[in-house]
Design a protein with these regions (language model features):
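Segments forming oxygen-rich coordination pockets for charged ligands
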Residues: 7-179, 189-196, 217, 237, ...
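ADP-ribose/adenylate-binding Rossmann-like module
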Residues: 196, 212-244
């Protein structure tokens, strides 16, 4: 049976965007970190949908909105999900042309005989990267301010009441209360986002607890998009933390291709909280864009 086609000429008024598509786009970005918004931007001849119709594709295979249904919409959905599967960046956004004939796009017969053509803008949308900071002391505060200016969404986890004050951090910072052992699942709401983690807590015991908690949460959520993990401290302190993790049976190999940057930051000199924060953020940004600086 051939797919049904509605006739919408090219000059048809742009259709209103369903409000659920707009509201779900922001919500889905926060939940999944990456979506593809598909919009018909041009139509010629008979097409299933109007110019302006939108469809939101999400990593779990679900969709919001529609482009008119049928084999045409199925092809667009498949293309959108493929971009998500490949982890495409915003530069992979494109306008793609679909011919609504029996010998359709990519040579796949659709059963459609509309004879029209539709161009669809497949817009890859990625949520702001997240920098999770374990430790809300002077370095953590300076790092939060710098990261917010660089476009990161910031989360700060600390067990000390005096460092849970929103006035110490930039607006919009997620302040998470943890105990000294970091037993709370503080990364769970962000595990689908591009995630960067800096451990800059007050002592080797809390550093160890934070790292153990991060590795535990990664083991429980293998789909996590961890891009960077760094630990502040001297080489002696770092060695002690690693020894303690080994004694607890915590295996760093769960990080896979993610390197533990320890000591954290680029060796640019300076030891004030602000200077340390800049060195950390420089390393994080370098990792984000796959750029490296030579370390001594």
């Amino acid at each position: 049976m051939r797919s049904r086609c509605s006739w919408y000429p090219a000059h048809t008024m742009i259709a209103a965007v369903p409000p659920e598509v707009l509201s779900e786009t922001e919500r889905s970005l926060q939940t999944f970190g990456r979506v593809v918004l598909c919009q018909i931007v041009r139509a010629e001849g008979s097409t299933p949908g109007k110019v302006g119709w939108k469809l939101l594709a999400r990593p779990d295979g679900s969709f919001v909105g529609n482009l008119g249904g049928g084999a045409f919409e199925a092809l667009v959905k498949a293309d959108a999900l493929e971009k998500i599967r490949l982890g495409a960046g915003v530069d992979a956004s494109e306008i793609k042309r679909y011919y609504l004939t029996e010998e359709a796009t990519r040579g796949e017969p659709t059963g459609m005989v509309c004879g029209g053509m539709a161009e669809v803008f497949l817009e890859v949308m990625i949520a702001a990267p997240v920098l999770a900071i374990c430790g809300g002391g002077p370095v953590g505060q300076a790092l939060a301010r710098a990261a917010a200016m660089a476009g990161f969404e910031v989360l700060v986890a600390d067990d000390r009441p005096e460092f849970r004050n929103p006035e110490l951090f930039p607006a919009g910072t997620h302040l998470t209360v943890v105990n000294r052992d970091y037993e709370e699942d503080f990364l769970s709401p962000l595990r689908h986002r591009d995630l960067y983690v800096a451990v800059v807590s007050r002592c080797w015991e809390t550093d160890t607890a934070a790292l153990a908690a991060i590795l535990r949460q990664l083991r429980q959520a293998p789909e996590s998009s961890l891009r960077y993990l760094g630990l502040m401290g001297s080489r002696r302190k770092i060695a002690r933390v690693k020894d303690e993790l080994a004694a607890r049976g915590v295996d760093l190999s769960i990080l896979g291709d993610v390197q533990l940057h320890a000591p954290i930051g680029l060796p640019i000199g300076g030891d004030s909280p602000g200077e340390i924060a800049i060195s950390i953020l420089a390393e994080v940004i370098g990792k984000r864009y796959e750029k490296s600086a030579v370390k001594s």
